[in-house]
Amino acid sequence: MKKLMEQMAEELSAAFEKAGYDPSYGKVTVSNRPDLCEFQCNGAMAGAKAYKKAPFMIADDVVAYLKDSQVFSMAEVVKPGFINLKVKGEFLADYLKAMAADEKLSVSAAKEPKTIIIDYGGPNVAKPLHVGHLRSAIIGESIKRIGRFVGHKVIGDVHLGDWGLQMGLIITELKHRKPELVYFDDSYTGEYPEEAPFTISELEEIYPCASGKSKEDEAYRNEALEATHLLQQGKPGYMALWNHIMNVSVTDLKRNYDKLNVSFDLWKKESDAQPYIPGMVEDMKEKGFAYVDQGALVVDVKEENDTKEIPPCMLLKSDGASLYTTTDLATIVERMKLFNPDEILYVVDKRQELHFIQVFRCARKTGLVKDDTKLSFLGFGTMNGKDGKPFKTREGGVMRLETLIKDINEEMFTKIVENRSVKDKDAKETAEIVGLSAIKYGDLSNQATKDYIFDIDRFTSFEGNTGPYILYTIVRIKSILNRFVEEGGNLEAGAILDPVNDSQKNLMLQLTGFGATVENAFEEKAPHKICAYIYDVSNAFNSFYHETKILSEENEAQKASFIQLLKLTKKVLETCIDLLGFSAPDRM
C-alpha cells in the first residue's frame, strides 16, 4: 500500500501541475511547527527562482486547487510561501483501516530481495561472554530481524574465534595439570573419550590462568605456540581436545545468547575458513597482487584519494603464520562459495575500522567478491559506566554478561514486587521479560556508532524513554482490551472512525509513520529510529488514554472505533519490539 506521505505528495503534485508548475515541487514533510499544522510543503519556495515569481504567489495558485481535496482539511499559505497542511480525519481513518488489514502494516516488500549475511556476535570460545559482547549481539540481531521483515533473505553468523593462540594455551595448561590424559599420549591409537575432561567453569578458569603464565614465562608461551601449531596441523589428541572445548563452550554460549533472545543461523568458526587459505594465497601470488615485504606476504590496498595512510593488508607473517586478515578474507571466499550473498555486513567495534578497510579493499582488488557485492562495516561505540569509562564491575574488572543480566533482572524484580501488579509466582518471569527490554532498548535507543552510558537505574525505570515504559504501554492496552472482552465486547466489531479529539488524531498520525520508519531503519542500519518511533507512539497513546473515556464511551460505534485503534496501536508496538528483539508480558 502507498504510504500516507506518498498519497499526500501525489495530491500536492497534481495541484502544482494544474496550476502550471512542475509537479516535482509537491513534496510533503512533517511540519516543524506542529502548533500551526501537521504537514507542510515548501515547493513554492524552491520554484520561485525557476518561475521568477514570488513564492507566496505560486503557493496561492497551488492552494486554489486543493479547496475540494479529499485528503486535506486545511491548506493555507503562510508568507513567504509555505503551504501549511492538515489531514482530513476521514482520510486518516481510511488509511489506518487499510494499514490494519495489511500483513506488513504498510511496509513495502523489497522490490529486489537480497541475500545478506550479517556477521555479529563474534565471541572467542573458552571465554565467558562479557559486556563488551553485548552491543554486537543486540544490534546485529535487530538488523537481521528488520531485514527479514522488509523482505530480504538475511543469514546471521556468529563467526566464532576458535583457531588462535587461546587454543594452544588451554591445551598447554591442561597438559601441565593432567599429563596423564590420553590426549597427550603420542602412542595412543584408540577412541578418545566422549566426555570432556573439564566443565565450562573449569574451562573459563583455565584460559586466564594460562594467558597470565604466557606473559610471564617465555618457555610456557613457546610451548603454547607449538601446541597451536600442532593443533592446526591436525594432531589427533589435540583435535579431540579442540572438539571437547568447542562442544562445552558452544553449549554455554547458546545458553547465554538464548537469555538475550539472540539466535544465529550459522555457528561458523575461524577454523572453517582455514582450508580456503592456501588456494587463496597462491592465487593472489600468481596474479601478482601479493608480494613479500620485510619477510611478510602483503597486498597493497592504498588508494589515491586516501586522506590517511592505509598500510598493506598482511596475508602471512614471516614465519608463514596466517592472521585475522587472512582468516577474514578466507571467510569471504567461503561465504561467496556457499551463499553467493549480495551483501556481507559486519557488526563490530568501531575501533576495528582500519582492519575492515584493508580486508574489503583486498577482497575487491583480488576479485574475491563480485563487482556488485556490497561489503559493509557497522562500527559501534563503547558501552560506558556512569563515570564515562568502559563499563566495569565495582571491583574494576570486566563484567560478565551473565552478571549484568542477573543484576538487571533483580532490579526489575524488586520494582515489580513493589508495584504489586503481578502475582509473586509470576514476578520472576515478568522481571526477566522486562529486564531484557531494559537492556536491549537501553542499548538500541542510542545511535549504534556512538558511545553511551549504561545507567541501570534509568534503563529500568517505568517512566521516560525506556524499554519498561514501552512495555508498560503495551500492557496497558492489553488490559483495556481484556476488560472490553470481559464486559461482553467483540474485538472484531466496528472500524476506525474519524478522530474525536486532538490526542486521538495525534495517535493516528503517529501510527501512519510505521512503514517509513521500518524501511528507513533497515536502509540506514539504524534500530534507534524504531526506538524513537515507538517512544513517540507510546507517548501519543498515553495522552489519548488520559484524555478519552474509552470503555465508558456510550456511543457503541465510537467505542468500537477506539477498540480497533487500540488493536492497531498494540500490533504496531508489538511488531516494533519484536524487531528490536524483545517481547511484552501480559501483566506488569
Task: Map each language-model feature to its residues.
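Short, cationic low-complexity segments
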Residues: 102-114
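Short, charged, solvent-exposed linker or helix-capping segments at domain edges/interfaces
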Residues: 94-99
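Non-catalytic interaction-recognition regions
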Residues: 1-93, 111-588
